[in-house]
Amino acid sequence: MKKLVCALLVASFVICGAMAASAEWKFERKVSIVCPWGVGGGADSTLRPMANLLKNILGQEVEVVNVTGGNGVTAIEYVYKQPADGYTFMLGTQSLFMQDIQGTTSMNFKDEFIPVARLVHAVNVITASKKAMDKKGYKTFSEMRDFVKDHPFEVSVGMLTSTGLDGASLKQALEGLDILDVSYPSGSEMNSALVGGHVDLMVTGTDEIAGLIEAGDIVPLLTLAEKRMNRYPNVECSVELGINSVLGPARGIFAKKGTPQEAIDALAAAVEQAAKDPSWQEFLVQGCYDERPGFAGPAEYAKACEEDYKLLSEYLKAEGVMKKDYYAK
């Protein structure tokens, strides 16, 4: 009985200590969150509504600073030069991990930046041109695979770069299929090509093409997820077909190494509170971000980032572009 009481007391002290740690930190001036991509894009559009909610919770201005260029590297370098004082954070995705692994950063992003909180975790979807589907006669991903086996290289897939997250998703999902790769300089041009039937397939987050799907111009063929999406219950998912591909864009907040843990905990707690706000919940629905759990605190998000780093390291190594091997034995 005494052991039980002692154990309960210890647990209570641990919990209270954790709560006190975040409560000890009080933001006393403006907080900046750097977005590595431009105004109006998916990352920026995710961060701004969260920043507005954080402003009310923290009682301080929360500024979104867009620092673009270098596929996110310019923002990494910018934040790395700022003091780790708890007032400068940055938004990050797996795209930054891939830049790090390819050696385009002056430092090791994996070692010098700390996951604070995940905001959203979208589902990637392989979509098809309605015009191309009607012409070639397939209606599902399984039927498309059968078509490709009989007609090698007659199906094309658009991509921005083979060394980005979408490229990794495609390579996993289409492994073993003789499909023609077509590069596009921008997502808007690729979308237009898909709608016009000039390319057969592409992969992107559901948040970016929901409107085109609703209009009937493109058709979701495969969701890269553990289970079928509630939005598209008749669309096959990768896991049910035995395809090991569930990569989806995860957007979260990172802090420079050396940032006070109290500041990290305080911001994570504020994000968790904001994530429960009805306006944020509505944003998740409107943005198609409600199919997977979004918010994750420091420990859970760090674990997810580690898993993505391992997976993307393997992919980039196979592509021959790995410059940093964090898992070399």
Regions found by a protein language model. Give the residues of each.
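N-terminal signal peptide c-region/cleavage motif recognized by signal peptidases
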Residues: 17-21
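Bacterial N-terminal signal peptides
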Residues: 8-16
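Beta->alpha turn/N-cap motifs
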Residues: 91-96, 162-163, 186-187, 204-209, ...
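N-terminal (or domain-start) structured segment
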Residues: 23-112, 154, 163, 174-203, ...
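An extracytoplasmic/periplasmic, membrane-proximal ligand-sensing/linker region
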Residues: 28-30, 262-329
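Periplasmic-binding protein-like
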Residues: 118-125, 222-257
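Hinge/capping helix and adjacent helix->loop/strand transition within the periplasmic-binding protein
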Residues: 27-30, 54-56, 78-86, 101-189, ...
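Positively charged n-region of N-terminal signal peptides that target proteins for export
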Residues: 1-4
